[in-house]
Design a protein with these regions (language model features):
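Active-site proximal loop and beta-alpha junction motif in alpha/beta enzyme cores
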Residues: 1-192
Length: 192
């Protein structure tokens, strides 16, 4: 798959409910963000955040990752263009904001991107690889080779998605794969 960040390898696990996997492009780390400002921008109290500094990570789409204490806080979070401006301070490049709470299976997540015209995305594969890197960095999931977990996203907006993550090599040094399956809602043929 040719993306703006370059070629992204894809594989399909065949079967009655096939999973489609993508290999996350190289992840870069950026600046950190103040927890109190992030909480205000998201309409939350700073006590709703885990004691982990929010950080910008990117595998093509710059995204601020904010770890919250529980799924209730994730469901109460909201980010509009005003909140995004508050969070960004003087940063000019557009960015997404990914909030999540660790769960026994991995993470319960939401992604907001008002600067891209997306109030909320139900399934963000391009941010789920960096989510894995963030969670490994702060010990929220194991960084051991072969680690697998899921990120549940889109539930609050009524479009529940399950994204599967597979860590290759210690701390993902050989890659982070993100996969899922789809429910076809339309089909078309294009003649050129």
């Amino acid at each position: 798959l040719e993306e703006k960040v370059g070629p992204v390898p894809i594989r399909v696990d065949k079967g009655p409910c096939p999973l489609i996997w993508l290999r996350t492009p190289p992840i870069s780390e950026g600046r950190t963000f103040d927890r109190t400002i992030c909480a205000q921008a998201l309409g939350l109290d700073s006590r709703d955040l885990l004691d982990i500094t929010p950080r910008l990570l990117s595998a093509g789409n710059p995204t601020v990752f904010v770890a919250l204490k529980d799924t209730d806080a994730v469901d109460r979070a909201w980010l509009d263009s005003h909140g995004c401006a508050v969070l960004k301070g003087g940063v000019h490049e557009p960015m997404c904001v990914f909030v999540f709470a660790p769960t026994t299976c991995g993470a319960y997540s939401r992604m907001f991107a008002p600067e891209y015209g997306i109030s909320e995305d139900p399934a963000t594969g391009s941010s789920t690889g960096p989510l894995a890197a963030f969670m490994m960095r702060y010990g929220l999931i194991s960084g051991a080779a072969g680690t697998r977990f899921v990120s549940e996203q889109g539930t609050k907006m009524g479009r529940r998605s399950i994204l599967h993550v597979h860590i290759h090599g210690e701390q993902g040094q050989h890659g982070i794969d993100v996969g899922g399956n789809v429910v076809p809602v339309a089909e078309a043929t294009m003649k050129l």
